[in-house]
Amino acid sequence: MARYEEVSVSGFEEFHRAVEQHNGKTIFAYFTGSKDAGGKSWCPDCVQAEPVVREGLKHISEGCVFIYCQVGEKPYWKDPNNDFRKNLKVTAVPTLIKYGTPQKLVESECLQANLVEMLFSED
């Protein structure tokens, strides 16, 4: 059995539903540019950060939930009124957060294995 549960979602509504379904659990969320049919994100920083974040998951506490959230295509993401920007204050991708706390890593911070590991391992 996995130490943690991973949920993959696309868009704000699916993210919101996933959070509601896992209410009461420690939730980490990784926001990334959406991928095309070939599995490639429009966000080059997200492509670089994903293996670092995946490696960091080895340090996540048992029973936590990891939500992998594709934020949409670039034009939607760049809209200052999109729900991620307005409701979650996620202003850049990639972003890794501990949901419900001020703890987050943004852009190049997601490339630093020590920071990713620290975020996942803090209680």
Swiss-Prot record:
Places the protein is found: Cytoplasm
Residues annotated with N-acetylalanine modification: 2
Gene Ontology CC annotations of this record: cytosol
Classification via InterPro entries: Thioredoxin-like_sf, TXNDC17-like, TXNDC17_dom
SUPFAM superfamilies for this protein: Thioredoxin-like
Any one biological process term the GO annotation gives: tumor necrosis factor-mediated signaling pathway
Molecular function (Gene Ontology), one example: peroxidase activity
Subunit structure: Interacts with TRXR1 and DYNLL1/DNCL1.
Main function: Disulfide reductase. May participate in various redox reactions through the reversible oxidation of its active center dithiol to a disulfide and catalyze dithiol-disulfide exchange reactions. Modulates TNF-alpha signaling and NF-kappa-B activation. Has peroxidase activity and may contribute to the elimination of cellular hydrogen peroxide.
Protein name: Thioredoxin domain-containing protein 17
Gene: TXNDC17
